[in-house]
């Protein structure tokens, strides 16, 4: 330990040295503020103090001095963000100072020997609220509150944002001489000459809070008096301190019998059974070090190899009228260090540096002394993450305590802007037809993945990028086509020229800088850069195309005829329907929803399925609340296993032309008394054959099993070799949809029940689920006149986790939550007309995307996990767009929304709906386990709430990502779980990406800089380049 006491570090006068009543160190550890009896607040350079022994050190010692009080200054405190400096004096006034970036206007004070100021600290506010001397001050950890106490026995709470008086607490019966805040931001404690310490519970107020909002805030939690029953009233202060882990309060001027002591109050039950005895006279102040310490030197690789870390302790310094500085820690019952006669008079205040290795002591003899410890003397300083972990059990952390106006904040902002600029250059290069430099600029993304050219695989190999499609439309052609649409002129009957109206969203432009909502048809073949990850759709392949408009549905009581497909409609040739009906935008293909061909269909014979007869309807359907149309009995059904596309009418001979193509063929007899035959062939060779007593309606299969659903409501399964896997499953009615995905099988029956089976485990994740809830919800939005038909089921799929995904003809998309046992709506037309992110072309966060992940069956991502639910959310939103455009409601509803925005009270409608849409996407991606979509939508959401300056949501998002800050004592799930992973991503990686996006918003630096420091994101340019090179080598 080194004691440093420069002769110039004092409040000296012409004839004597004035008392120093208070001292405090700034959060960045660069400034020391002192206050004394000369009525001055002085700001010193900590670096100059540490180098006082160096005669060659020429930098300024005193940075500034302020004399805006009319008497003795008793307390001086920096705000946790370093933005403000508060002082309280015996003139009953509290002064708030802030650092002006402009240089000081004067060189030195006239008539004094004061050195010229280096920094320009100006008076920002003068707070009037006390009737007597102000004895002590304290800021809340999140800077939202400033609390002052004084000799008028009052506790005055001020807003840390507006400095308005929020509340006055008059609960003490004598002078209040100490105040300290809980680092978890839940309580504060005050010490008084009435020989009590009172604990107050509070909720951090909003920046614009007023006195009326604080009526029920700041509630007295408890009052502690046992350790102070016989404490003397001769001390000038009773400065108490709260431990950095939130477990204890150290209270000065306590007694244990006849001996002066320091009382340690435990947070759990507010007990005060522990006393620190080591002073011969009453103590004035005790102060915990802001850092936790290891009792033994920790191993650098302890976290990597899973070894247990050494125990953590807190360190406390105390001093008082015996002129002795005593250092304690929680690991020993005796003091670690005792320094006697450290001053010639009483010690009035203590202040630790942020690193916890130096403590300053202010004395009434007019001097300030620094005790600087070497590494290991007090212990080994733990990382700041340990403070956060210790505070998590109390529902708080050191959030928002970062310095906003320091170099770290500038580094974070520069890093954020650099990443955004690289992404912008990449997108601009792609639009201008110059992808080379753009790919070079964005060779490395934030997570280390290289998306350009070749993508690094997990085993070190490289995978070539897919070739570009030659038929893609360039950006210039797209602009010309849009301009042509805008300038399309029509001539009316009276000869006047009029410009044809164009849907605003189709032009791709907008007045706002925010993403514009666009309803883009899925049939477009141009390479539109959207905000959806380019991944393979994780849904079962709909080989059996559903009728146009989906499977018709009827709910009980709608007074309409039972919906059954008419013979005339089905027997109408497909070519005639294509010529007379509306042009489809998308069609059901082998791999899901595919764009419809823009060119005219080829001439010749159009294959048409041969229907034998309608299926026999089960009598149960007459008593069901939901009734779905049942498919007709077809003469034969072909189901290929490979990716080759085969029409249902293709003969077995044509199917053998597809190499390695395994085909399951079901042949139904013309007579009902004959059995149905089902065969599996490979290259025309028979693999296996089986017979069923009833006609087969639907077939499905994967590489794990085959399945067939029959007219009598039975469901049969076979292994790939043709071995029956289980007895026939008896369904309540005829099947209408049969889908397979990996080991999962979905069967939807005519009464609207969805059955899901895991063939590998021979189990079901949940009982049969009815479609009635989603059809009822859809029906409530129909016209009261009943002119709009009931929505039909356009598709029902399974993902690789066995989750049901259903779309309706009104555009709504749903999935069934196996954890909530309820249907949840993921996509609807409400977002299409109100959100700015619907089919948005804004891809400002596309530089943060990872490369696409391969199919579920074989490909793995970098984390070793399959890409579950990939592409489901974009697929459902494209379906909503398709149905929206087909029904012609887009233009009308967008006009209604624009008219709504012009009304009073709806100014923030579009912004609120857009943010809610992103939250809906994030919730859906998280519930489905869509790893890529979750990360992308999370970054889009962070960028938007940062631009909207929604600090509450930003703080909650950062706390949720860091893990467990908002959870209760019991372990939760999802966001509130104790796991290090969140939707397959490491929480630290997600937090780093969000902090990087939010780094450019200076108003949020109070929240983001602290997280950036934890993640080592506040490095300079040279350090940053070194770190980036290391990341590239690692990747």
UniProtKB/Swiss-Prot annotation:
This protein's GO CC annotations: chromatin; HIR complex; nucleus
Biased composition (Basic and acidic residues): 408-425
Annotated keywords: Chromatin regulator, Nucleus, Repeat, Repressor, Transcription, Transcription regulation, WD repeat
UniProt KW Nucleus keyword: yes
BP GO annotations: chromatin remodeling; DNA-templated transcription; regulation of DNA-templated transcription
Annotated Gene3D superfamilies: YVTN repeat-like/Quinoprotein amine dehydrogenase
Main localisation: nucleus
InterPro entries: CAF1B_HIR1_beta-prop, HIR1-like, HIRA-like_C, HIRA_B_motif, WD40/YVTN_repeat-like_dom_sf, WD40_repeat_dom_sf, WD40_rpt
Stretch list, region Disordered: 393-479
WD repeats: 15-54, 68-107, 129-168, 171-210, 232-275, 299-338, 342-383
Keyword Transcription: yes
Location relative to the cell: Nucleus
Pfam families: Beta-prop_CAF1B_HIR1 (PF24105), Hira (PF07569), HIRA_B (PF09453)
SMART domains cross-referenced by the UniProt entry: WD40
Family, per entry: Belongs to the WD repeat HIR1 family.
Biological role stated in the UniProt entry: Required for replication-independent chromatin assembly and for the periodic repression of histone gene transcription during the cell cycle.
Protein name: Protein hir-1
Lineage of source species: Eukaryota, Fungi, Dikarya, Ascomycota, Pezizomycotina
């Amino acid at each position: 330990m080194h004691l440093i006491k420069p002769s110039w570090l004092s409040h000296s006068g012409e004839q004597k040295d004035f008392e120093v009543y208070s001292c405090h160190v700034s959060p960045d550890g660069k400034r020391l503020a002192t206050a004394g009896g000369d009525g001055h607040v002085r700001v010193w350079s900590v670096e100059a103090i540490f180098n006082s022994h160096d005669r060659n050190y020429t930098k300024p010692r005193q940075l500034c001095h302020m004399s805006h009080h009319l008497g003795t200054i008793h307390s001086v405190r920096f705000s946790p963000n370093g933005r403000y400096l508060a002082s309280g004096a015996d003139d009953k006034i509290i002064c708030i100072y802030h650092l002006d970036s402009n240089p000081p206007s004067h060189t030195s004070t006239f008539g004094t020997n004061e050195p010229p100021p280096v920094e320009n600290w100006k008076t920002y506010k003068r707070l009037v609220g006390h009737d007597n001397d102000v004895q002590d001050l304290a800021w809340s950890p999140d800077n939202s509150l400033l609390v002052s106490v004084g000799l008028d026995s009052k506790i005055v709470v001020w807003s840390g944002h507006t400095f308005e008086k929020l509340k006055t607490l008059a609960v003490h019966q004598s002078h209040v001489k100490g105040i300290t805040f809980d680092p978890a931001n839940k309580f504060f404690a005050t010490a008084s000459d009435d020989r009590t310490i009172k604990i107050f519970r509070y909720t951090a107020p909003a920046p614009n809070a007023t006195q009326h909002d604080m009526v029920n805030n700041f509630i007295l939690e408890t009052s502690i008096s046992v350790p102070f029953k016989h404490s003397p009233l001769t001390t000038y202060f009773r400065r108490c301190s709260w431990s950095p882990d939130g477990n204890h309060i150290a209270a000065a001027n306590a007694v244990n019998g006849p001996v002066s002591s320091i009382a340690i109050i435990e947070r759990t039950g507010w007990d005060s059974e522990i006393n620190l005895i080591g002073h011969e006279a009453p103590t004035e102040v005790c102060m915990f070090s802001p850092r936790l310490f290891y009792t033994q030197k920790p191993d650098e690789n302890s976290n990597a190899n899973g070894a247990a870390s050494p125990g953590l302790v807190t360190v406390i310094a105390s001093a008082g009228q015996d002129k002795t500085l005593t250092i304690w820690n929680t690991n020993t019952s005796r003091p670690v260090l005792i320094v006697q006669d450290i001053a010639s008079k009483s010690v009035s205040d203590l202040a630790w540096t942020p690193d916890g290795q130096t403590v300053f002591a202010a004395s009434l003899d007019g001097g300030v002394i620094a005790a600087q410890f070497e590494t290991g003397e007090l212990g080994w300083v733990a990382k700041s993450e340990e403070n956060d972990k210790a505070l998590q059990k109390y529902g708080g952390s050191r959030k928002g305590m970062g310095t906003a106006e320091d170099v770290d904040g500038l580094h974070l902002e520069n890093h954020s802007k650099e990443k955004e600029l690289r992404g912008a250059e990449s997108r601009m290069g792609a639009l201008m037809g110059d992808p080379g430099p753009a790919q070079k600029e964005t060779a490395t993304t934030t997570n280390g993945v290289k998306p350009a050219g070749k993508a690094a695989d997990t085993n070190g190999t490289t995978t070539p990028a897919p070739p570009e499609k030659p038929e893609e439309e360039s950006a210039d052609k797209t602009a010309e086509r849009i301009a042509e649409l805008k300038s399309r002129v029509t001539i009316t009957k009276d000869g006047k020229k009029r410009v044809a109206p164009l849907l605003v969203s189709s032009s791709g432009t907008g007045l706002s800088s925010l993403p514009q909502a666009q309803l883009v048809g899925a049939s477009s073949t141009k390479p539109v850069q959207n905000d959806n990850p380019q991944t393979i759709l994780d849904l079962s392949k709909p080989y059996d195309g559903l009728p146009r408009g989906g499977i018709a549905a009827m709910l009980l009581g709608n007074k309409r005829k039972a919906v059954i497909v008419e013979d005339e409609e089905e027997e109408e040739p497909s070519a005639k329907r294509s010529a007379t009906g509306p042009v489809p935008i998308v069609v059901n293909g082998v791999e899901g929803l595919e764009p419809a061909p823009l060119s005219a269909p080829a001439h010749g014979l159009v294959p048409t399925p041969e229907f034998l007869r309608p299926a026999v309807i089960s009598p149960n359907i007459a008593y069901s609340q939901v009734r779905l149309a049942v498919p007709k009995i077809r003469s034969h059904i072909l189901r290929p296993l490979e990716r080759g596309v085969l029409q249902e009418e293709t003969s077995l001979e044509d199917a053998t032309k597809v190499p390695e193509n395994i085909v399951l063929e079901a042949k139904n007899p013309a007579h009902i008394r004959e059995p149905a035959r089902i065969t599996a062939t490979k290259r025309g060779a028979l693999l296996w054959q089986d017979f069923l007593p009833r006609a087969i309606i639907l077939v499905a299969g994967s590489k794990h099993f085959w399945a067939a659903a029959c007219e009598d409501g039975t469901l049969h399964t076979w292994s790939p070799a043709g071995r029956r896997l289980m007895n026939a499953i008896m369904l309540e009615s005829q099947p209408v949809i049969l889908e397979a995905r990996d080991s999962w099988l979905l069967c939807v029956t005519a009464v609207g029940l969805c059955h899901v089976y895991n063939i590998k485990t021979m189990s079901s994740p949940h009982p049969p689920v009815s479609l009635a809830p989603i059809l009822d919800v859809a029906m409530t939005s129909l016209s009261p006149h009943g002119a709009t038909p009931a929505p039909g089921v356009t598709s029902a799929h399974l993902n690789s986790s066995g989750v049901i995904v259903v779309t309706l003809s009104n555009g709504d998309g749903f999935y069934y939550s196996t954890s909530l046992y309820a249907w949840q709506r993921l996509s609807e037309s409400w977002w299409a007309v109100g959100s700015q992110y619907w089919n948005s072309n804004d891809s400002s966060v596309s530089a943060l995307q990872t490369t696409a992940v391969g199919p579920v069956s074989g490909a793995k991502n970098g984390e070793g996990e399959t890409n579950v639910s990939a592409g489901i959310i974009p697929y459902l939103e494209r379906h909503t767009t398709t149905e929206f455009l087909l029904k012609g409601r887009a233009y009308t509803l967008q006009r209604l929304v624009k008219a709504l925005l012009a009304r009073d009270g709806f100014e923030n409608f579009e912004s609120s709906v857009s943010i809610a849409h992103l939250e809906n996407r994030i919730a859906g991606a998280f519930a489905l386990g869509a790893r890529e979509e979750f990360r992308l939508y999370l970054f889009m959401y962070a960028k938007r709430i940062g631009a909207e300056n929604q600090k509450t949501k930003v703080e909650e998002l950062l706390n949720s990502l860091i893990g467990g800050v908002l959870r209760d004592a019991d372990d939760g799930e999802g966001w509130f779980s104790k796991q290090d992973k969140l939707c397959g991503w490491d929480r630290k990686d997600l937090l780093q990406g969000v902090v990087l996006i939010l780094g450019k918003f200076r108003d949020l630096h109070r929240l983001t800089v602290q997280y950036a420091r934890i993640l080592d994101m506040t490095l300079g340019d040279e350090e940053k380049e070194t770190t980036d090179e290391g990341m590239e080598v690692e990747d």
